[in-house]
Swiss-Prot record:
The keyword Cell membrane applies. This is Protein alcS. It comes from the Eukaryota. Residues 1-14 have a biased composition (Polar residues). Its main location: membrane. It is found in: Cell membrane; Cell septum. The gene is alcS. Belongs to the acetate uptake transporter (AceTr) (TC 2.A.96) family. PANTHER family: ACCUMULATION OF DYADS PROTEIN 2-RELATED, PROTEIN ALCS.
Length: 272
């Protein structure tokens, strides 16, 4: 009994060292609550009630897609505008188009799907798949354009043949329609995203017109439309860089907050 009572007295007593140690303990937050505006800025998707716990446990994959997008579209836009004598409609960038444009965007699309972000999943997945298709079309191993050449084996000649140009222009037409749909959905997020899809819609419209004019040997108008497409793509690239910088600044906690023109408030007011 004496031993048991001694143990109770010993455990009931707290040494000054223990009190000092307990007093020095502080609570460290392990999670951060994002507002609807912050969520839409980081994930480029409206905040819904169906957001799962994974979005709190995993990193934000959206900047990865933006990085792949801008590093692909920026040099391609310079090529389309013919800067420093660049030619070839992007054939020189086949590798970056497939691995940076296609690979990173499709990878991000899968990650957005896991997080439950439907809109960016669809956007990055379809644009990434387009880059895969565009790059593969220019790759001789896929033999997509060679049958349109006179020798049926020359990919470069096939890419500039009237039959190929008339046919491939339809892909640009419907990509433009898809960008228009994305534009309507982006009005729920922010103004920068809306501007990106606006310029991308123009890019595909100009490219389809350019291909059809070049198919009838109207090089003057066709080349001007290609330059116009390159200019619009360059604007989209700069907007993409801006959005990427804004997201990366927020991700590392820099005090500089770049405005992106939140549009969710407009829709919230309309809902009321």
């Amino acid at each position: 009994m004496d031993t048991e009572q001694g143990l109770k007295n010993h455990t009931a007593k707290t040494s000054p060292h223990d009190e000092t140690a307990m007093a020095s303990l502080t609570t460290i937050p392990t999670s951060v609550t994002l507002s609807a505006e912050q969520f839409e800025k980081l994930y480029l998707s409206p905040l819904t009630q169906r957001q799962g716990m994974l979005s709190k446990q995993m990193g934000n994959p959206t900047p990865l897609a933006l990085g792949g997008f801008v590093i692909t579209t920026t040099p391609l836009s310079c090529c389309l505008m013919g800067w420093r004598g660049a030619t070839g409609s992007g054939i020189a960038f086949t590798g970056p188009i497939i691995f940076l444009g296609g690979g990173l965007l499709v990878l991000t699309s899968i990650l957005e799907f896991i997080l439950g972000n439907t809109f960016p999943c669809v956007v990055f997945g379809t644009i990434g798949a387009f880059w895969f298709a565009f790059g593969c079309t220019m790759t001789p191993a896929f033999n997509a354009a060679a049958p349109f050449s006179t020798s049926a084996t020359d990919t470069v000649a096939g890419l500039s043949s009237p039959d190929f140009l008339n046919t491939y222009a339809f892909l640009f037409i419907w990509m433009g329609v898809l960008m228009l749909i994305f534009l309507a959905c982006a009005t729920r997020t922010n103004a920068v995203y809306v501007a990106i899809f606006t310029t991308l819609t123009l890019v595909f419209g100009f490219l389809s017109g350019a291909y059809w004019r070049l198919a009838v040997a109207d090089a003057l108008v066709g080349n001007r439309l290609v330059v116009a497409a390159g200019a619009c793509l360059f604007v989209a690239s700069m907007l993409g860089f801006y959005l990427l910088v804004a997201q990366l600044f927020d991700s590392v906690g820099l005090p500089v907050r770049l405005p992106v023109g939140d549009l969710s408030r407009f829709w919230d007011r309309r809902a009321r």
